C-alpha cells in the first residue's frame, strides 16, 4: 500500500451511529426491526402515463421560468432528489445476461434506478411490462452512494485451467450485496440545518458529489464530511452487514464490476477484490477535476480509466488526441468576443478594486489558475491525460505511474504491467468519462464541454507503449461552456447521450469503428461492417480510394496494401470525424407545469413534465443535423450552465416499456416489447422525480432528394416523448422496504435460474448441458457482394497472348493456358441425337507429368475444364481471357460451405443465388461487342440445358461413350477407363476425382464436325475462386469471324448460358458437365444420377481411375483445384 493512500480501519460493525447494526438505530435498519418492516411493506407500483405536448405559449412560459429560476415551489429538503443513477451491472439489470424471467419472448431485462434523497434512498425496478416497482426504500440517514454489487465471476470463468490459489467467493451464501456510504444522524442534522448548501459551494455547505457517471450533489456541511468515510456492505438476502471499511478521507463514489469494487476519493482510487473485498490496488496519482465530480473514472467489464496527473513518455501509447482540431468560424468569433468581454470585465474589476481598496475576483482567478497551470516545473501536473489499467488480476502494492515493482505474488499470477494504455485525451482537465458495453470505446469530456472525444483502445500484450488509441470522433456540443454530469452508450455502441448540469441531454450518432454515419450504418437493425459491399467488391478503402498496390496512397506502403486487414496498433491512425447532435432533450427543473400537461397522480407538486423535452419550440422535437433553430436554442440554454441551479440527470438506452399505453383494441400479434427497431428508446431521469421514455426513430434527411439517396445519405432523428413515470417520494409517506427482502423481490428473485453462476451448476442433466453448447461452429461475419467489379459495362473482354518464354507477373499466374497435350478422346457415333446436340467427341481423362505452373503453355494446369463444357481446338497456342472474381471473402454464398452445410429448407435460397449469379455473368458477357458479333452468327444446333432436358429419352440413350486413342495419346494411361460401356447413358458424364495435384486433364466437348469452340474454367483455391474463359482456335476467337463449317458456341447462348458456375446439388443435363463443390473431404465434380445402378458403375469407374500413391507423391502441392 502506498504511504499516502487512504487509511483503512479494521473491518467490523461501526458503533457510532454509522453502521447498520448500531444501537442508536439511526443506520439503515437495525436488527429484526428492519426485517419486520420489509415483510409487512407493500411495494409501490407506478404504471406508465402518457405525455402531453405543451402548447407554444406554455413552452415559452416554462422556458422563461427555467431560465430565471423564478416561482420555484418550496420543497422539503429531505424529500429532494440529490442524485440519481441507473444500475447496469447488477445481476437483474445487466442487459448482457438473459431476458426477464416472467415474460415470454424477446423481453428486455428490467431497468434498475437508484434515487438518493436528502434523507434515505430509493430503488425502482422497471420491467418490460412497464409497471415500475419499488424494490428498496428507507428514510434514515443520508446516503451519498449506493451500488448493487454483481455476482463475481467464478474461477472457471476467469481462467479455463484454474489456479489453486484463486480466491473463492467469501460471501456466496449472502449475496446479493449492496455497498453504500451512510452519513448517520450527524450528517442528517447538518443537512436539515443548512439546506442552503445544496448549491455548488453555495452557503456554508460543502459539496460531496456522488456517482462518477451521474454526478449528483448532496448538500453536506464540511464538518460532516468525515462521517462519509466508511463503506458498508450489506446482504439483501439476510439483512446483515457483512463488512465495513473505514478510510481517513471522504468517499466520493463506488463502482463495481464482476472482478473488482472501485472506491474513489479526492485524487485517490482504491480497488478491492470483488470476491473477498480485500485490497487489490491503490492509485494516488489522479488529477483533480474542476467539474461536479472531483475524481471522474470509468469502469468497464475489465478496464479502469482515470485522469492521470502527468504524462509518462516511456508508457505513452500511440494515437490519442493530437489537438482540439481546427475551430469553426462561429467558435472563433465567440472566443474573440469572450476574450474581449473578459478583458473589459477584469479591467473594470481592477478599477473598482483600486477605488474601493478591495481585491474582488481574486478567489475566482486563483481557482482557475489551480487547473490552468499545466507547466512550470518538472513536477507540474498536466491535464487531459488518461490512464487505463487492467483490474482483472490481483496487483497489490503497485503504483502504475510511479514504476514501483510488482510483488512476487502478483508476478507469479501473470499480472505484469497493469497499464493497458496511457495517452492524452484533452488539452483541458477531464470532468467525465465512460466505457461502452464492450469496454473498448471510451468517451471523455473536458471542463469546457464544447467537444467530447470518442476513443477506441487497441491493447498490446507487451505493454502500453506498443498499444494504440484511435481517436474516432469529436462530438461537438456547442461553442458555449457546459458541465457534463452523465454519459450513456447504447448497447450496440451506435448512439451516445451526454447530459449537462442544466438538464439537457445531447444524442450523438457514432459507430464502434469510426467513420461517417449514414443510412447504411444507422437504419439497419444490426451493426454493419465498416466497408460496404460496394467498397469491398470494388477494392476501395474507407476513404473511397483504391486499395490496389498500383495506386496506393503515400501513407500506405506496398506491404500494407497487400494485407487484407491493417494492424490497428501501427500507424497511420484514423483521423477523427466531427459529429453534431441529432437531438437535444431538455428537462424542466420542477414538476409544477402549466395547464394542459399530463398529471402525475400523487406526485410532489401534482404537475407533469415537458413532453417534448425541448426548452422552447413546442412540437419541434425531431431535430436534424442542419437545424439552426435547435443550435440557437441550445446556445441560449447553456449560457447559464456554470451559474445556474444544478439538476441531477441520468439517462440510459433500453427497450421500450410503453406498450401498456397502446389502445385496448390494438392487435397483440406482435407486442411492442418484441418489436425491433434500429435504435432503442432513451430513458431520462431528472431531479424532479419524473422518468421519461423518449422513442427514437431514424429517417432520411429532409433536404436530400429521393433520387440522390445512397448509403452515405445523412439521417435525422425523430424524438417522441412516449411515456412517463412519477418515481418521486410520496407526501403520504410510503412504507420502508429494507433488507432482508422477500423472495419475490426483483433484486434477489430467481437468481439461481440466471446465467450468472458457474456453468457446472446451470444444468442438472448432462445431455441438456451438451445441447446448450454449440461446438465446432463456423461463423461467417461478412456477406458477399451484390456484384463484381468486372461485371460492369465498362469492361470489355479481349484476347490476351503470352509470348513463350516471357516472364510472368502475379496477374499472369492467375491465367490458365490450354493447349493440346496428351489426351484421350472419345468418339461419339454419328447419330441424329449427336448431330442435334453438336457433340462429336469427348476427350477422356489423362494425367501429364508434374510441371511448375505456368511455365509450359502446352500443359493443362489448374484443373482446367473440370466441371465445365470445355470446347477447344486441336492446334495453336492458348489464348486465355482473364476473368478475376476477387478474394474468397467476396464470394456470394461460398459454394464450399453452401454444398457442405446445405439444409433442406435452404435449397431454394441457394438456388436463387446460383440463378442470379449465372444471369449476372451472362449480362456481363453481353456487354462485350465481340460476343455480340459472335452471338449473331450462332445457329440453332446448340441447345440449352432446359432444351436438353426436353429431348426424348430414347434419343438420349443413343449416345455411347467409346475411347479411341489419338496420335497424341498412343498409349493411354492405365488409370483411364477405356471400357466403352462404362457409362451407358448419354446424360451421365464420367466423374473426375479431384486431388491436390497441380496439373489435371482437360475435358473437351466437340461440335458435330469435331471442331473446338471455347472453354470455361472454374478454379477454386483455398482462399480464392477465379474463372477463365478461354478460346484456343483462331476461327473460334471472340473477335474473329465464326467458322462456316462449325458454328461457334456463343458465351451468351446455348450451353454456356446455363452452365456457367452452376453449383446446384441436383441438375440434369445431356452432354454437359455440371460442377458441384463439396468440402475438403468430398472434393468431386459429378452429374446428378437418377438411376442407382448407374451410380454404382460410376463408383467402380472412380476406383479404377484413382491414381497410385507414388503418382500422388510426385505431384507438387499447390493450390487445390476443384
UniProtKB/Swiss-Prot annotation:
It comes from the Eukaryota. Pfam families: BCAS3, BCAS3_WD40. Keywords: Cytoplasm, Phosphoprotein. GO terms for biological process: autophagy; macropinocytosis; response to starvation. It is found in: Cytoplasm. Residues 14-37 have a biased composition (Gly residues). Its main location: cytoplasm. The keyword Transferase does not apply. Regulates macropinocytosis in pericardial cells. Belongs to the BCAS3 family. This is Breast carcinoma-amplified sequence 3 homolog.
Amino acid at each position: 500500500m502506498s504511504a499516502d493512500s487512504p487509511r483503512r480501519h479494521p473491518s467490523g460493525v461501526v458503533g457510532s451511529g454509522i453502521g447498520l447494526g448500531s444501537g442508536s438505530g439511526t443506520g439503515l435498519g437495525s436488527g429484526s426491526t428492519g426485517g419486520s418492516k420489509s415483510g409487512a411493506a407493500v411495494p409501490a407500483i407506478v404504471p406508465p402515463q402518457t405525455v402531453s405536448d405543451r402548447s407554444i405559449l406554455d413552452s415559452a412560459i416554462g422556458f422563461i421560468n427555467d431560465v430565471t429560476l423564478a416561482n420555484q415551489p418550496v420543497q422539503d429538503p429531505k424529500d429532494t432528489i440529490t442524485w440519481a443513477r441507473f444500475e447496469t451491472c447488477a445481476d437483474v439489470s445487466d442487459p448482457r445476461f438473459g431476458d426477464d424471467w416472467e415474460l415470454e419472448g424477446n423481453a428486455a431485462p428490467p431497468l434498475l434506478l437508484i434515487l438518493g434523497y436528502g434523507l434515505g434512498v430509493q430503488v425502482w425496478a422497471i420491467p418490460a411490462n412497464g409497471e415500475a416497482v419499488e424494490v428498496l426504500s428507507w428514510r434514515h440517514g443520508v446516503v451519498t452512494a449506493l451500488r448493487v454489487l454483481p455476482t463475481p465471476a467464478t474461477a472457471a470463468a476467469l481462467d479455463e485451467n484454474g489456479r489453486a490459489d484463486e480466491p473463492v467467493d467469501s460471501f456466496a451464501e449472502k449475496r446479493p450485496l449492496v455497498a453504500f456510504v451512510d452519513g448517520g444522524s450527524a450528517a442528517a442534522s447538518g443537512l436539515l440545518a443548512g439546506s442552503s448548501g445544496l448549491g455548488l459551494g453555495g452557503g456554508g455547505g460543502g459539496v460531496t458529489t456522488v456517482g462518477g457517471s451521474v454526478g449528483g450533489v448532496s448538500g453536506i456541511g464540511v464538518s460532516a464530511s468525515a462521517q462519509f468515510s466508511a463503506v458498508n456492505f450489506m446482504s439483501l438476502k439476510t439483512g446483515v452487514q457483512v463488512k465495513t471499511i473505514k478510510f481517513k478521507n471522504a468517499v466520493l463514489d463506488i463502482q463495481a464490476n464482476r472482478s473488482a469494487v472501485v472506491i474513489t476519493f479526492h485524487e485517490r482510487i482504491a480497488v478491492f477484490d470483488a470476491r473477498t473485498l480485500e485490497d487489490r490496488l491503490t492509485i494516488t496519482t489522479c488529477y483533480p477535476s474542476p467539474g461536479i465530480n472531483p475524481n471522474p473514472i470509468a469502469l468497464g467489464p475489465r478496464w479502469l480509466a482515470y485522469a492521470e496527473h502527468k504524462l509518462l513518455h516511456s508508457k505513452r501509447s500511440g494515437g490519442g488526441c493530437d489537438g482540439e482540431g481546427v475551430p469553426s468560424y462561429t467558435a472563433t468569433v465567440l472566443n474573440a468576443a469572450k476574450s474581449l468581454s473578459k478583458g473589459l470585465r477584469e479591467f473594470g474589476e481592477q478599477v473598482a478594486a483600486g477605488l474601493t481598496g478591495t481585491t474582488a475576483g481574486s478567489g475566482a482567478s486563483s481557482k482557475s489558475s489551480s487547473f490552468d497551470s499545466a507547466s512550470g516545473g518538472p513536477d507540474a501536473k498536466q491535464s487531459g491525460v488518461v490512464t487505463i489499467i487492467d483490474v482483472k488480476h490481483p496487483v497489490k502494492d503497485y503504483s502504475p505511474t510511479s514504476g514501483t515493482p510488482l510483488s512476487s505474488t502478483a508476478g507469479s499470477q501473470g499480472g505484469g504491467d497493469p497499464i493497458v494504455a496511457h495517452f492524452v485525451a484533452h488539452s483541458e482537465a477531464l470532468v467525465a468519462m465512460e466505457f461502452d458495453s464492450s469496454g473498448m470505446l471510451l468517451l471523455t469530456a473536458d471542463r469546457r464541454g464544447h467537444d467530447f472525444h470518442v476513443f477506441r483502445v487497441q491493447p498490446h500484450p507487451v505493454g502500453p507503449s506498443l498499444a494504440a488509441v484511435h481517436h474516432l470522433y469529436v462530438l461537438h456540443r456547442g461553442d458555449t461552456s457546459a458541465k457534463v454530469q452523465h454519459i450513456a452508450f447504447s448497447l450496440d455502441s451506435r448512439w451516445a447521450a451526454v447530459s449537462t448540469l442544466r438538464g439537457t441531454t445531447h444524442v450523438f450518432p457514432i459507430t464502434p469503428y469510426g467513420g461517417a454515419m449514414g443510412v447504411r450504418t444507422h437504419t439497419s437493425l444490426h451493426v454493419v461492417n465498416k466497408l460496404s459491399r460496394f467498397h469491398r467488391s470494388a477494392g476501395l478503402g474507407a476513404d473511397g480510394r483504391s486499395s490496389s498496390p498500383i495506386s496506393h496512397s503515400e501513407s500506405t506502403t506496398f506491404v500494407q496494401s497487400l494485407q487484407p486487414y491493417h494492424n490497428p496498433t501501427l500507424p497511420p491512425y484514423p483521423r477523427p470525424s466531427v459529429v453534431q447532435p441529432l437531438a437535444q432533450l431538455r428537462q424542466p427543473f420542477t414538476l409544477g407545469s402549466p395547464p394542459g400537461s399530463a398529471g402525475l397522480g400523487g406526485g410532489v407538486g401534482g404537475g407533469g413534465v415537458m413532453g417534448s423535452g425541448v426548452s422552447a419550440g413546442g412540437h419541434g422535437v425531431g431535430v436534424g443535423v442542419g437545424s439552426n433553430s435547435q443550435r440557437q436554442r441550445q446556445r441560449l440554454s447553456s449560457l447559464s450552465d456554470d451559474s445556474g441551479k444544478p439538476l441531477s440527470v441520468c439517462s440510459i438506452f433500453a427497450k421500450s416499456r410503453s406498450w401498456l399505453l397502446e389502445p385496448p383494441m390494438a392487435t397483440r400479434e406482435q407486442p411492442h416489447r418484441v418489436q425491433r427497431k434500429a435504435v432503442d428508446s432513451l430513458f431520462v431521469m431528472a431531479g424532479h422525480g419524473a422518468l421519461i421514455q423518449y422513442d427514437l426513430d431514424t429517417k432520411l434527411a429532409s433536404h436530400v432528394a429521393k433520387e440522390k439517396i445512397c448509403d452515405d445519405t445523412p439521417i435525422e432523428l425523430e424524438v417522441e416523448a412516449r411515456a412517463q413515470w412519477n418515481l418521486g417520494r410520496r407526501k403520504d409517506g410510503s412504507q420502508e422496504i429494507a433488507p432482508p427482502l422477500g423472495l419475490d423481490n426483483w433484486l434477489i428473485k430467481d437468481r439461481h435460474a440466471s446465467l450468472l453462476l458457474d456453468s457446472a451448476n446451470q444444468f442438472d442433466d448432462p445431455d441438456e448441458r451438451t445441447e446448450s453448447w454449440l461446438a465446432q461452429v463456423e461463423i461467417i461475419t461478412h456477406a458477399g457482394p451484390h456484384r463484381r467489379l468486372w461485371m460492369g459495362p465498362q469492361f470489355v473482354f479481349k484476347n490476351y497472348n503470352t509470348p513463350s518464354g516471357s516472364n510472368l507477373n502475379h496477374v499472369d499466374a492467375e491465367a490458365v493456358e490450354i493447349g493440346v497435350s496428351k489426351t484421350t478422346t472419345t468418339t461419339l457415333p454419328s447419330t441424329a441425337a449427336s448431330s442435334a446436340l453438336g457433340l462429336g467427341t469427348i476427350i477422356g481423362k489423362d494425367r501429364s507429368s508434374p510441371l511448375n505452373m505456368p511455365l509450359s503453355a502446352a500443359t493443362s494446369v489448374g484443373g482446367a475444364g473440370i466441371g465445365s463444357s470445355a470446347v477447344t481446338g486441336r492446334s495453336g497456342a492458348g489464348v486465355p481471357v482473364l476473368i478475376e472474381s476477387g478474394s474468397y471473402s467476396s464470394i456470394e454464398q461460398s459454394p464450399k460451405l453452401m454444398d457442405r452445410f446445405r439444409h433442406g429448407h435452404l435449397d431454394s435460397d441457394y438456388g436463387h443465388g446460383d440463378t442470379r449469379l449465372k444471369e449476372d455473368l451472362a449480362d456481363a458477357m453481353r456487354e462485350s461487342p465481340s460476343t455480340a458479333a459472335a452471338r449473331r452468327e450462332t445457329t440453332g444446333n446448340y441447345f440449352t440445358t432446359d432444351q436438353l432436358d426436353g429431348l426424348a429419352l430414347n434419343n438420349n440413350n443413343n449416345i455411347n461413350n467409346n475411347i479411341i486413342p489419338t496420335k497424341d495419346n498412343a498409349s493411354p494411361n492405365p488409370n483411364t477407363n477405356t471400357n466403352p460401356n462404362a457409362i451407358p447413358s448419354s446424360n451421365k458424364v464420367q466423374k473426375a476425382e479431384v486431388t491436390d495435384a497441380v496439373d489435371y486433364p482437360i475435358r473437351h466437348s466437340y461440335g458435330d464436325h469435331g471442331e473446338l469452340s471455347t472453354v470455361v474454367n472454374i478454379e477454386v483455391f483455398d482462399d480464392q475462386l477465379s474463372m477463365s474463359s478461354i478460346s484456343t482456335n483462331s476461327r473460334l476467337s471472340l473477335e474473329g469471324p465464326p467458322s462456316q463449317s462449325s458454328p461457334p458456341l456463343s458465351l451468351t447462348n446455348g450451353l454456356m448460358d446455363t452452365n456457367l458456375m452452376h453449383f446446384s446439388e441436383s441438375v440434369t443435363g445431356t452432354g454437359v458437365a455440371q460442377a458441384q463443390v463439396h468440402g475438403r473431404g468430398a472434393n468431386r465434380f459429378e452429374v446428378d444420377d437418377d438411376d442407382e445402378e448407374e451410380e454404382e458403375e460410376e463408383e467402380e469407374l472412380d476406383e479404377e481411375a484413382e491414381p497410385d500413391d507414388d503418382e500422388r507423391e510426385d505431384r507438387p502441392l499447390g493450390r487445390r483445384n476443384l
